Amino acid sequence: MIKSWTKKWFLILFLMASCFGHLVATTGEKYFKMANQALKRGDYHRAVAFYKRSCNLRMGVGCTSLGSMYEYGDGVDQNISKAVFYYRRGCNLRNHLACASLGSMYEDGDGVQKDFPKAIYYYRRGCHLKGGVSCGSLGFMYFNGTGVKQNYAKALSFSKYACSLNYGISCNFVGYMYKSAKGVEKDLKKALANFKRGCHLKDGASCVSLGYLYEAGMDVKQNEEQALNLYKKGCSLKEGSGCHNVAVMYYTGKGAPKDLEKATSYYKKGCALGFSGSCKVLEVIGKESDNLQDDAQNDTQDSVQ
């Protein structure tokens, strides 16, 4: 399963990279570049027209861009049928993100009837095209036994491959499996290495997982200041647990001088990003502003529960 915001931003970043990468001067690629330029200007009408032309000229990334616009209603009326149509066309033209998007829609039932066999089919196609999102999604499905028989070995294999394809979310998941001994022998060194790689790839959860190892001194020398910096990085990458952990450290004075104002600010950030622990602490702050209750939620949290 790909979180909707994760999939959307991964698509946007990929498509922007495609725009600035070296492109052979074919007509389809020219239209794709013109579409991206129109999109930047907020000229959605021209963007759609140029993406359609590039798609009709067998530019898979152009079809995928159209699919994304129709799925999310970005500058056009949301139309799931059109999104599926263009994603399918993009996938057939060997664009791995189009395959991943179809897989996600069928796995989650987003605008289509939930269909695990179809989800697996499209994820496999995307993974075969060396798409990290698809390989990582297959890893999650095998780990959870979603639509397939639970198989930790396959989950680890697909997740490792996804990590090697620079999908940071899967690096964090591989680290989690080694840290928690899920289907493998516990190995904190391998966990640490994967968390580092994921954080380097700008996956916020990986930064939080790495920070947790430094805070607890698990296979590394305990370093609360380093932990705080990693939690801050996770927070800046929109990982709510990172914001929460920064708040806790400012509240308790771990890794930095105690600062209740900063603590409250980071609790608010964590809550805004959907981290329930931060929201619960804020409720307490609202009721007892002069006496912040220290409960079970007011502890640092590992990113993967």
From Swiss-Prot:
Q: Does the keyword Secreted apply?
A: yes
Q: Which cysteines does the record link by disulfide bonds?
A: 55-63, 91-99, 127-135, 163-171, 199-207, 235-243, 271-279
Keywords, in A-Z order: Antibiotic resistance, Disulfide bond, Hydrolase, Repeat, Secreted, Signal, TPR repeat
Gene Ontology molecular functions = beta-lactamase activity
Main EC class the enzyme belongs to: hydrolase
- Which function does this protein serve? May hydrolyze 6-aminopenicillinic acid and 7-aminocephalosporanic acid (ACA) derivatives. Binds to penicillin.
Identify this protein by name: Putative beta-lactamase HcpD
Native organism: Helicobacter pylori (strain J99 / ATCC 700824) (Campylobacter pylori J99)
